Regions:
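Carboxylate-rich, polar loop motifs that coordinate divalent cations or form catalytic acidic clusters
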Residues: 1-298
């Protein structure tokens, strides 16, 4: 991510987080940030987010807080004897609410950080009590003003309204063709019109227009996207929607006429850098480019 908003992407490579800079020759150069951002080979960096002078780093072994001013880091982990510790160590996604609260998604619910007590309040699903969430497997989090959207692996979309503590669940209903196309949700994106785009696993791309409760489906079978597993969504400075898929490359779409992609980007394995399996897309307004995280590299 462009943590410093200077056109240089923070990226984890072999256990260390570097800044990646595009050169005038079209190459990518990496530079060290701090010795505190060197961890160990094999660590999975799942997400990063800036909050004031700190950077929160989600991994598969816990949540790290890096203070840029003091050049220090701290690890937060699950403690079975502490209900205010992280609910689980495998982090999936991070988000900041409009009132500057940090939310951390895991494979066992969501966690809201309390800076006063330096611990967490948990949002989890339980079959034995009234739960705010209907699934603990959180894939992605999207903040939209007073609403927080959670994309889950098995429960579709959960919409949380914190002030009223209300959850609205959007799930696939085989009897309702205007419901969510499938329940495993990889990514949620809100465009400038307030419409919600939802990428699912094998269910294609979903569009929920602002003010409606119905989902429009875009699928590979109808030639609307190149693959039904949608893994990343972002727009560029021309208002186009970039749709990353896991197995079909990248689709560039016009949000006002999304029935056919404007362009599909992919490369074959023999090129040495296949662009079939896309994990993340990040638009870079400084360099007017798109950073592409694929299964074979950046």
């Amino acid at each position: 991510k462009d943590i410093d908003e200077d056109g240089k992407i923070w990226t984890g490579i072999n256990g260390t987080i570097y800044k990646i800079t595009p050169t005038p020759q079209g190459q990518l150069e990496k530079s060290s940030i701090s010795e505190q951002l060197t961890f160990w080979p094999g660590i999975y960096f799942k997400d990063m987010i800036a909050k004031e002078n700190e950077v929160w780093i989600a991994t598969h072994i816990g949540l790290f807080r890096y203070n840029k001013s003091n050049n220090t880091r701290k690890l937060y982990e699950n403690n079975q004897n502490d209900p205010h510790s992280l609910s689980q160590n495998y982090l999936t996604n991070l988000a900041i609410t409009d009132d500057k609260q940090l939310i951390a998604g895991t494979l066992r619910g969501a966690n809201i950080y309390n800076p006063i007590t330096d611990n967490f309040e948990r949002l989890t699903h339980s079959s034995t009590s009234n739960s705010l969430l209907n699934s603990n497997f959180i894939n992605c989090i999207r903040v939209d003003g007073q609403h927080i959207w959670f994309g889950t692996e098995s429960g579709g979309i959960n919409k949380l309204t914190p002030k009223r503590l209300v959850i609205h669940n959007y799930q696939h209903d085989k009897e309702n063709p205007a419901s969510l196309s499938d329940n495993p949700v990889n990514v949620i994106y809100e465009d400038k019109e307030g419409s919600l785009w939802v990428g699912t696993v094998e269910g294609g791309l979903n569009l929920k227009k602002q003010g409606t409760e119905q989902f429009i489906h875009y699928r590979w079978e109808r030639g609307e996207i190149s693959h039904n597993s949608v893994s990343s969504l972002v727009n560029d400075n021309q208002g186009r929607l970039w749709v990353g898929t896991w197995g079909g490359g990248i689709n560039i779409m016009n949000p006002k006429a999304p029935n056919r992609p404007l362009q599909v980007i992919y490369t074959h394995p023999e090129t040495g850098f296949p662009l079939f399996f896309i994990a993340v897309l990040v638009y870079d307004p400084t360099n007017n480019g798109m950073w592409i995280g694929a299964n074979r590299g950046l």
